[in-house]
Regions:
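NAD(P)H-dependent oxidoreductase Rossmann-fold/reductase module
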Residues: 1, 30-38, 177-179
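Primarily recognizes the serine-hydrolase "nucleophile elbow" in alpha/beta-hydrolase
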Residues: 1-30
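Sec-exported extracytoplasmic/periplasmic mature domains
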Residues: 5-8, 44, 75, 153, ...
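Extracytoplasmic/cell-surface-exposed regions of Actinobacterial cell-envelope-associated
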Residues: 6, 10, 31-33, 60, ...
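Substrate-gating cap/lid region and adjacent catalytic-acid/histidine neighborhood
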Residues: 15, 24, 61-206, 222
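Helix-rich cap/lid subdomain of alpha/beta-hydrolase
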Residues: 31-67
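Alpha/beta-hydrolase-fold serine-hydrolase catalytic core, especially in secreted/extracellular enzymes
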Residues: 153-158, 166-167, 192-277
Length: 277
């Protein structure tokens, strides 16, 4: 979604599919500080500065020398930082006139955060982990779908697809992970590494897989996945679920807003205010 919306890629996309990947939510100042901290050791390695604090301060300046150095870094050195693309969240969306006008199909799972919380030791209690999964997933899902549609402001058609299968409200439970990050890829292809995370051999899961593939094929060949595009008025989103035998597909308005999710987080009494922080 970020590439398709970038002015640098204007004219290069006719359409694009983004799975669990939208625009950014981070504060620009905080994101810049984070970037500088992560790249500072590389500047020290190159002998530009004796310490990382001085290097980070330099990286925050707008000089051409900073840009030249960053653009000249070997990709392998950047990759060694660990998923650097995630660090580039700055919350800034290009103006509508600057964006690439590409149709988008945006897909996201119901419990995107389940795997991330499982691998994170910081939420010590089961209540804290449940809180992180519930609201982290809701915010991740929103930022990967409707937030993108809102930010693009009608510059191109956008379709939203929500994978409910395996999640809390699904007719089929996936123990431990729910509707996990990467589930759409597993439903698209059994060769995906995410296929090992759940048994998708039931007739219902296979029917759901077929419906997802049909939507993808329709979008790529005809320009529409087969349901209504998102608008600010109806906020259309197609929900993909399945029982043990059949796929269960429903069209409804997007279930949350950023404000409603944050309000629910504040009202949740399962954790104290200190624990939430």
């Amino acid at each position: 979604a970020a590439l398709a919306g970038s002015p640098l890629f204007r004219g290069r996309f006719q359409k694009a599919v983004a799975i669990s990947g939208g625009l950014s939510l981070a504060d620009p100042h905080a994101a810049a500080q984070k970037l500088a901290e992560n790249f500072a050791p590389l500047a020290v390695e190159d002998g530009r500065f004796a310490d990382t604090a001085s290097a980070a301060e330099w990286l925050l300046t707008p000089g051409a020398d900073v840009r030249e150095w960053l653009c000249g870094l070997e990709p392998a050195r950047i990759a060694a930082l660990g998923k650097p693309a995630i660090l580039y969240a700055d919350g800034v969306v290009p103006s509508r006139d600057a964006r690439s006008a590409a149709s988008l199909l945006l897909l996201s799972s119901a419990t995107e955060f389940s795997g991330f919380v499982r691998d994170d030791l910081r939420p010590a209690s089961s209540a804290a982990r449940a809180y992180a999964v519930k609201y982290g997933s809701a915010l991740c899902r929103w930022s990967s779908t409707e937030a993108v549609a809102e930010a693009l402001g009608g510059s191109a058609p956008v379709w939203l697809g929500l994978i409910d299968y395996g999640g809390t409200d699904s007719q089929t439970a996936i123990p431990g992970l729910g509707s996990f990050h990467g589930l759409p890829l597993a439903l698209f292809s059994s060769e995906s590494s995410y296929s090992a995370c759940a048994d998708l051999s039931s007739a219902g899961a296979q029917a759901l897989s077929a419906r997802l593939k049909q939507a993808l094929a329709g979008f790529m060949t005809s320009g529409s996945p087969g349901w209504d595009a998102w608008t600010p008025q109806d906020r259309a989103a197609l929900h993909f679920d399945a029982d043990s035998e059949t796929a269960c597909i429903t069209l409804s308005s997007y279930p949350d807003t950023q404000e409603s999710i944050r309000a629910a987080m504040a009202a949740d009494t399962s954790l104290s205010a200190a624990e939430k922080e």
